[in-house]
């Protein structure tokens, strides 16, 4: 199996699908984690978006491009909301909605009236830079003191993803690519490969966020139980004396 763009795309799709399945299994056990529900839905939407890329050879390209990018935008918004929910920070609905709407509108403009693969890739890269930077900023700015380790590690992963897409903004698209993303050239291939590794790292970062949050909750519950026993101990001793 040669390591070309279509092969790596298939591997990336299988990876995203496996991560989505794994988070779904976690959700069966950790049903009380609202952020996990949002992240799981986001990962399934990401896998659906990549499915639309794989089907472009069998179905009309223009509707699939619009559908895939709309689903991708919704996936990013849910991931963003999941981070805000994990940090217990309010996030006005209109802010990510405006960002996602502007992204989808840009894709529609450069796939229907003015088809241009290079501009579409730049629009997608700019959207990814903004969303990942937003999540990294929230994790650094609003990290609870007892959860800073996992929040800062996750922020580093999101920041690395933002850097990759920022670099992609300046990379050229192969002149003979036309409207085919699989022929975009070696520089785009390199950023896609880096994105696969960062997607795996993001999966572990999200799990670390959940684990540290549960550890903090367990320590808090243990302290509460200890205080409760300490308060009850004198009355219990008096009852023994009686």
What are these regions (language model features)?
Residues 223-242:
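Interdomain coupling helix/linker and adjacent catalytic-core signature
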Residues 1, 182-183:
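Juxtamembrane membrane-water interface segments that cap and precede transmembrane helices
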Residues 19-36, 48-182, 189, 194-199, ...:
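Juxtamembrane segments at transmembrane-helix boundaries
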Residues 204, 211-214, 218-225, 229:
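Heptad-repeat alpha-helical coiled-coil signal-transmission segments
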Residues 1-19:
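Hydrophobic transmembrane alpha-helical segments in integral membrane proteins
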